[in-house]
Amino acid sequence: MNILVINAGSSSLKYQLLNPETGALLAKGLCERIGIDGKFTYKPQVEGKQVLDAVDVAMPTHSEAIQAVLNALVDKDNGVIGSMQEIDAVGHRVVHGGEAFAGSVLITDEVMKALEECIPLAPLHNPANITGINACTAVMGKDVPQVAVFDTAFHQTMPAKAYMYALPYEYYEKDKVRRYGFHGTSHKYVAGRAAAMLGKPIEELKLISCHLGNGSSVTAIDGGKSVDTTMGFTPLAGLPMGTRSGDLDAGILEYIMGKYGYDIKEMVSILNKKSGVQGVSGVSSDFRDLEKAAEEGNARAQLAEEKFAYEVKKYVGAYAAAMGGVDAIIFTAGVGENDKGIRAMVCDGLEYMGVKLDPAANDVRGKETVISAADSKVKVLLIPTNEELMIATDTAAIVKGN
């Protein structure tokens, strides 16, 4: 079964063609500068096929981008499938499903209406996701099933005590202001892999998943269900990130805005784009640059790393308390998979909880493995995330179910 996975942005479109049954990746690539001057990248994962790297292709809209993807996939010389009929379904990453969607869903006219209603919750992302769906329908026709897979859906199992903000209740009732959480597809994927690695049913496990990258979140997963997560109404909440502040005292906004005359848009832009480890370090939002600067003695870079790891550690402790224990801690995403120093800093001091890192096992990048010591009561796992495979797997399951 071949699933085309689409992640549509406002002027870009990432794609992968996968077989979720075997886990095989057939091709992947990127359409950039849609509506501007169109750059197309195609990377077939089959030997002897030619890579196209940022070649000029006219893509006035997302429909032309989808057509370019299909043309490349079925190209007689460099294609990886014989015809479009070999694509069984399309799986779309959709950022926000609000309270309407607690799982992935076959896209229908009713679903499209509900997606439109979620736009106020994710005004930057959902319109682009909807555009991607419409482009696939326009080019591929209505006979090819399409499935929406939401970043937020995995967290819809959170109890009210975890998702409710202590604001006047009418903001939740009328405006749906609550914790939604993000990175759900990633957290769901690594939780499933953790259960497989530990050889136990996921229903019996208490897991803490640390998705650490330019955007970061920690999720408490009890019996395979998300029970709490650090990101909130927006992806700005929780941990400090590459350029996002994470949690802070809301009174700071009033203080800074009053002192410098910023309006709310300027303030939110500072919180989203100029804060996090970049703001603290003054060096970079990239943890590789931070590590280099810290090693060279840059005190602010060292502080940024320490602050980040400290906040992750705090949430690990909090979520272990919330679940009444923890069986395994998972590190995933760019920083989680590749930065042994951050992993060590997070685990340092958690020995009282039964966490014991093996320094030799931790000296690894991007490989699925156990990095805790043999006698560690709580297992520490490094699991590379694969959101596209999770989207393809969900899509296949829904299409087969229907």
Where are these regions (language model features)?
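Catalytic phosphate/nucleotide-handling subdomain of diverse soluble enzymes
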Residues: 222, 227-263, 269, 333-364
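Short glycine-rich, Thr/Ser-proximal phosphate-binding strand/loop in the N-terminal lobe
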Residues: 12-59, 232
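Short beta-strand-loop/turn "lid" adjacent to the catalytic site in phosphate-handling enzymes
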Residues: 73-125, 145-147, 153-162
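Adenine-nucleotide phosphate-binding core of ATP-dependent small-molecule kinases
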Residues: 269, 276-280, 287-322
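Glycine-rich phosphate-binding loop of actin/hexokinase-like ATP-binding domains
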Residues: 154-257
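Internal helix-turn-beta structural module
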Residues: 302, 306-322, 326-327, 336-402
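Phosphate/pyrophosphate-binding loops at sites that engage ATP/ADP/AMP, CoA/4′-phosphopantetheine
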Residues: 72-88, 196-201, 316-327
